[in-house]
């Protein structure tokens, strides 16, 4: 796989586009482990974001029934279509944050790091069975952080409200070409059953985590405009907010269940 990638780079005189976050994974063992982690069979339809020069795509094509690979760089799209003769791979040229996703049940990707947050939230809006994703290490650590941890954030809360998430492998920067400035990590995501999913008001979550080190009451007061409250309206409900569940708890200590309780209280009191 590694030899194939460098052969294509040499053949086409390619330089990675840093604006598109292009860092090609060059360690065969990591590629193989991620394909194994996806638990693929012939019935699976895989979505890959940023196939690059097709090294992971090729491995996926041998295990899955169908692979959809979304690539933004027209140079790479042309190379993929010219160099590979896949019968079960469809290359889609476009921006993964904007194009319509085809139907799929699994995701396997070495993600462009600059779209990590928006693409992850987009994934969470789809019903998939399993995702194996490479992220920047710091981002991956935030995804798995628990309430009270230093890295716990809005991302941690929203991901864990809807899915089981596990950091399964740390990857050094030498595993990529060109070499990035940061280490990476492999995350495995599995959506929770509907009965366990906690649907949260996103405006409330943003308002709270805008001031993650503050208490719940203080955060809501500072961010009342994010809840659609005018200054006059806020004055009328200030005392109600002070009596919210977990009012004196720090925002970064809140579990999804506790945020749901706060949401229910604010709804009952017609604040959101």
Curated annotation (Swiss-Prot):
It is found in: Cytoplasm. InterPro entries: KsgA/Erm, rRNA_Ade_diMease-like_C, rRNA_Ade_Mease_Trfase_CS, rRNA_Ade_methylase_Trfase_N, rRNA_adenine_dimethylase, SAM-dependent_MTases_sf. CDD domains: AdoMet_MTases. S-adenosyl-L-methionine binds at residues 23, 25, 50, 71, 95, 110. HAMAP family: 16SrRNA_methyltr_A (MF_00607). PANTHER family: DIMETHYLADENOSINE TRANSFERASE, DIMETHYLADENOSINE TRANSFERASE-RELATED. This is Probable ribosomal RNA small subunit methyltransferase A. The lineage of its organism: Archaea, Methanobacteriati, Methanobacteriota, Thermococci, Thermococcales.
